[in-house]
Amino acid sequence: MKRIKTALVSVFHKDGLDELLKKLNDEGVRFLSTGGTQQFIEGLGYECQKVEDLTTYPSILGGRVKTLHPKVFGGILARRDNEGDREQMAQYDIPEIDLVIVDLYPFEQTVAMADCKSAITEQDIIEKIDIGGISLIRAAAKNFNDVVIVPSKAEYPVLLDILNRNGAQTTIEERRMFATKAFGVSSHYDTAIHQWFSKS
C-alpha cells in the first residue's frame, strides 16, 4: 500500500469533485493546483498551493502553459525506489506528487457544438485540445507504481470508494487499474482529435 500525501488537481469540470476533495482533505492530503481549479478548492475552504508558487513561473500564453514544468513532471515521474531519482529530487527541490486528478478540456463536445451550426470557430475547437492535462495523465499513468491517476470525472467515485475503505492508501493493483483507464482516456481523446483533423 502507498499513501497519498500530495495531490495535483487540474480539471475542467468541477461537478462531483467536492466530495472527493473533502475526503482527501480529511485524510491530510495536500493540494496543488492552477487557475480555476485552485480557486474552486480554496472556495471550499481548503488550502491549496499554486503550481506557479512551486515552479516560480507564471501561467503563460493565455493559459496554454501552466503545469508543463520539471518541478511538476519530475514530482510525478520520479521513481521512489530509485536512488538517482531521489537524489535529483532533493537537488532540485522537487516534491513527490502521489495523486493526479485530471478532467480534460471538452474537445468532442466543442466539435459537436460546431457541427450543430453554433458560433463555434475552428480556433475555438483548437483551443480545446488539451496539452497539459493529457501530459499529466500519461506521466502519472506511466509511473503507476508510485502515483494514482484519476483521468476523468467518471473515476471520482471510484477513488472515493477506495479512500472510504482504506484511507489515503492504494494498492499496486488499484493504481494499475487507474493507469489502464487513463491510457484509455488518452487514446480516445487523441482519436477524436485525429478524426476531426482528418475531416477538416
Regions found by a protein language model. Give the residues of each.
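N-terminal glycine-/serine-/threonine-rich phosphate-binding loop
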Residues: 1-54
